[in-house]
Amino acid sequence: MLTDMDISRRAPLKDIAVLGAEFGLLPDEMQLFGKTKAKVDLRVQQRLAEQQQGKLIIVTAVTPTPHGEGKTVTTIGLTQSLKALGNKVCACIRQPSMGPVFGVKGGAAGGGYAQVVPMQELNLHLTGDIHAVSNAHNLGAAAIASRLYHETRLGKAEFELQSGQNYLDIAPNGIRWHRVVDHNDRCLREIEVGLGENNGPAYTSGFDITAASELMAILALSRNLADMRARIGKLVLAVNRQGAAISAEDLGVAGAMTAIMADAVKPTLMQTLNGAPCLIHAGPFANIAHGNSSVIADDIALKLADFVVTEGGFGSDMGFEKFCNIKARQSGLTPSAAVLVTTLKALKANSGLTSDADINAPDQARLEAGFANLNWHINNVARYGIPVVVAINRFATDTDAELNWLIEAVAGTAAFGCELSEAFSQGEAGALALAQTVMRACEQPSEFTLLYPDDMALEAKLSTLAEVGYGAAGVSLSEAAKLQLQELSALGYADLPVCMAKTPLSISHDPQLKGVPQGFIVPVRELVLNAGAGFITALVGNVMTMPGLGLVPGYLKIDIGADGEITGLG
């Protein structure tokens, strides 16, 4: 079989202006970037404000493993198959961060014959949205550091006299706003800034990956440009000596930060291998942020398509949970059905049983033990009140006997249906049965339900997420988290939803606990207010907001020839 890159290169692409017109966009609603991609102007939201919405489908997965479950492959494959069945359909996915592209995970365009193309353009830069987020974020960091410098240098009276601005009285070590970069770079996790003569005062800070920036979450959750501007104004950059928050609005930098992101607020239109439209927008990670593409992209797609297929990062305890309790809660755009992706390899890897056998080899004992993980995720999705269809992403090494056993086992669960998907090897033809079952699921009566109400106490939300969302015995808060809990409640932020930042490699907080862990306590070490994004992040265990590169990073495979052709992506 051809490589992903070769398939992408050989694909007969439709001119993006033609594809956009067929999708329902007007010429002045598209800002073209060559013939392969276009920004979608938000004026289309106003034109289609009264348009009836299509059906929203959210794709999620079992607990991820190093073998790859094929969630994006299934998302794109399902989109292609829905189109092949005569439906007007659109996929909405996140823009890949270059950190994972050059790290371990690789690209995020799908794979095989279920891809967004050209895949090299999607995986590297695209239309520059992530760079805009990085620059806007770092402007905020430079602005608050500069303000601290000038206030310290001049004192209150002289500062106000010379600058004409209010003295913010920034506390020593009161700056909360890190800098960001779109790479995995562990040595930047903790740094000292302001060292040297006339550069200070010095304080401890650090870098996060851009996907972890609150600005990225704001981009993904904003309804329009005005909403994004208002949210950016609420960003908490520092605290003063009295402990009160200093916002981007207080600093006077919110307008400039928003201006940098003026084009980033527009989704990017691309296409799948069979010419289905795909809107790419925003890229928050699901382990350290809320892990879903933008509300704006969903809103536009739902007004133009019969079916919209989107995905949440990692397993259903991560991106799907945050899709429901953060994204859908804020946007009001709720799903009609969910697709839960699994593989034989994933279930064996999640079995908790050790084996020297090849993961591709038949192993009924491991498969049966790992089925508990799939059943947990089925029940987890079903508790939100929507029908769930299990998609078994078939690999060439899978045996019919094990596949048939799994299909029969799923029939005894809460799943609406179960279908094999061979979209990777067969493209649109490989997921037709899945598409038909998903269409039937979308017609079922459903009542979307949140895990907790807005007015639940903040500590109770944490407990509910841990106990109901993960099956934990409870939560434990560090002393710092206990103080932060009191502060956030006193300041009136207890009505915000919670975004758990934890490992994706287990339903629990511990990546070593496989299958369906029980009796564990979720350790919350820190609570972080994201006033602009509208949620509170609970940092759990040892999760990092700046990843590091592995021993054998992905960039080792990537090169470019004299003809300009990039190799090694995928």
Swiss-Prot record:
Residues annotated for ATP binding in this entry: 65-72
Documented EC number(s): 6.3.4.3
Record-level GO BP terms: tetrahydrofolate interconversion
Annotated source species: Shewanella sp. (strain MR-4)
Principal EC category: ligase
GO terms for MF: ATP binding; formate-tetrahydrofolate ligase activity
Signal peptide annotation: none
Keywords associated with the record: ATP-binding, Ligase, Nucleotide-binding, One-carbon metabolism
UniProt-recorded name of the protein: Formate--tetrahydrofolate ligase
Pathway assignment: One-carbon metabolism; tetrahydrofolate interconversion
Catalytic activity: (6S)-5,6,7,8-tetrahydrofolate + formate + ATP = (6R)-10-formyltetrahydrofolate + ADP + phosphate
PROSITE patterns reported in the protein's UniProt record: FTHFS_1
Superkingdom field: Bacteria
Encoding gene, per UniProt annotation: fhs
Keyword Manganese: no
Entry's family note: Belongs to the formate--tetrahydrofolate ligase family.
